[in-house]
Amino acid sequence: MSNNNFKDDFEKNRQSINPDEHQTELKEDDKTNENKKEADSQNSLSNNSNQQFPPRNAQRRKRRRETATNQSKQQDDKHQKNSDAKTTEGSLDDRYDEAQLQQQHDKSQQQNKTEKQSQDNRMKDGKDAAIVNGTSESPEHKSKSTQNRPGPKAQQQKRKSESTQSKPSTNKDKKAATGAGIAGAAGVAGAAETSKRHHNKKDKQDSKHSNHENDEKSVKNDDQKQSKKGKKAAVGAGAAAGVGAAGVAHHNNQNKHHNEEKNSNQNNQYNDQSEGKKKGGFMKILLPLIAAILILGAIAIFGGMALNNHNDSKSDDQKIANQSKKDSDKKDGAQSEDNKDKKSDSNKDKKSDSDKNADDDSDNSSSNPNATSTNNNDNVANNNSNYTNQNQQDNANQNSNNQQATQGQQSHTVYGQENLYRIAIQYYGEGTQANVDKIKRANGLSSNNIHNGQTLVIPQ
């Protein structure tokens, strides 16, 4: 016999599930894009939920495992999408910062156009104006860098303001360099070397402070733009050698000053952060220790108080127990004394009772002969009285019989099963209770019982 004979209709008609098809679907989902993956996973879940004949035993457990893995995978995909969306938001913020910087740069260019005309007039008057300006501004920058360092928030605001101020100055230098159209290749070579040195220094500084890249993206972007502007200014200064070299020197001095100030600010910020971390870490260690010590001290105090109270209560209980024992002993002693007194009194009473009984016995022994004599006399008197009574009754009966005979009363002898009622019917015509009572009074009967051969007097 096959195993199908032992299956019911449910098992015979249920749908089979092939895990291989599910595996192929998962592989195809991995190959396709994310939208198709979500659609296929939802379809697979809906197919599993819409089955009319769910599997049993091992196949059911396997399907549950597969659905659980699909659900966990969907959750991971959603989490990945959310993280990607957050990263894109951050990139948009960076783009917004770059756009804002570009707008500021355009504004600075417009301002520089207005200043260019005045600068051209200055160039006509004297070519050494740029050098004089560079030498006069350098001590001011040094004095600014040697001032007191503010807090981290103030430093960030200061950086932004200085970066915005440095842009118009670089534009001024650029225009001054382009305005000198006479210098040759010597100015170009010097400007290229200085720009390369500045760029190399900037790369080294960026590599040293790579841990603080997220906080200083705006400053780096400004430096890169300034370096590009410096290169363009150096290339454009092909005609003016002396004046162009002076403008490039001024630009390099300003960049050096800016880089030194940036490095000092970064070092100060790093030191402040490290000191804050040290202080915060030390306080984080101290606070739990102090809290634990306080908690342990409080527990010890309360525990000591509880132990003292417990010991005091024990001593009080012992005192009360001892006092109660003493009181019970006193009561027992008093009761024993009372019992002894009662026993002695009862013994005395018993002795007196025994003496009384002895006296009574002696009295009874003396009174017994007299009592027997009196009893004998009483018996004799009773016998005499009984004899006289019998004589009187006999005489009375005789007299009554004589009277009845004289008066003509009738007599009746009982035969067979006669009774007083039949006798009353026979002589009086009616067997009433009054007639029966007459017969009973005449014969001195107390009951209705009569016997055969008995003679009865029947009154008229």
Curated annotation (Swiss-Prot):
GO terms for cellular component: plasma membrane. InterPro entries: LysM_dom, LysM_dom_sf. Residues 1-277, 313-411 are annotated as: Disordered. Pfam families: LysM. It is found in: Cell membrane. Keywords: Cell membrane, Membrane, Transmembrane, Transmembrane helix. Residues 1-40, 74-128, 203-226, 313-359 have a biased composition (Basic and acidic residues). The chain crosses the membrane at residues 285-305. Residues 41-57, 177-192, 264-273, 364-411 have a biased composition (Low complexity). Its main location: membrane. It is a single-pass membrane protein. The keyword Mitochondrion does not apply. NCBIfam families: elast_bind_EbpS (NF033598). This is Probable elastin-binding protein EbpS.
